[in-house]
Amino acid sequence: MNNVKRIQQELRRRGLDGVLVTDEKNQRYASGFPITDGAVVVGLEKSWLITDSRYIEAAEAAVDGSLTEVVLYDREHPLTGIIRSLCSGMARLAAEDKKLSHAGYLGYEKALGRELLPAGDMFETLRASKSEDEIACMIEAQRISEKALETVLHIIKPGMTERQVAAELVYNMLKNGSEGNSFDPIVVTGSKTSLPHGVPGDKVIQSGDFVTMDFGSIKHGYCSDMTRTVAVGSASEEMRNVYDTVQRAQLAGVAAAR
């Protein structure tokens, strides 16, 4: 999956010659490869993924060479020097002003010896509309989460702690193909279920408790997010009434949003 052409179209629409991509998530969006150090430069006709020796082999195998060239930086060929060379013919070069600190933005201007234009909401605008490939990744991430939950529902029992249930969710998401957690999983039980973003701890699950789980998987950089509440053992009439009331409210909200 490569979004270079979409970015190039947006550059033309904005009257820009190129953009320096420094945010890790947007670097992956632009190149199709996740890096933690380096940069991506997208010009009107070509793009470059600049990385170090730790990632060079994997990057070359992963990116579409017809659209993106992988460039190695090291001590003899520093990152800013390579960026300066690649962007020398770009009169109007933008940078991610919303992702860089003010000091970072000025630092790049000083290192490159030129003024940078603000990219503004370029990537937010592009990423708000998902391609079929992106939607497929999100669906797969959700499938992984649902499969993990299905397994964990057969594991949860009185005597387990919130932390143990969270560990089972994480393990089963990874086992089913997740690249990691969309966010730190939330697992709370009993009185702690009133905490929307409670942190799983050593609280022990009792028979008759509600357990709320909020978790998500990642596939090709795209995340899922799901929340489920289940009763362990049996649910009292009051618990069923509360559960049904919340579900009706949720369904009404979904219907109104369509």
Each predicted region: which residue ranges?
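Active-site neighborhoods and metal-handling regions in enzymes and metal-associated proteins
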Residues: 1-258
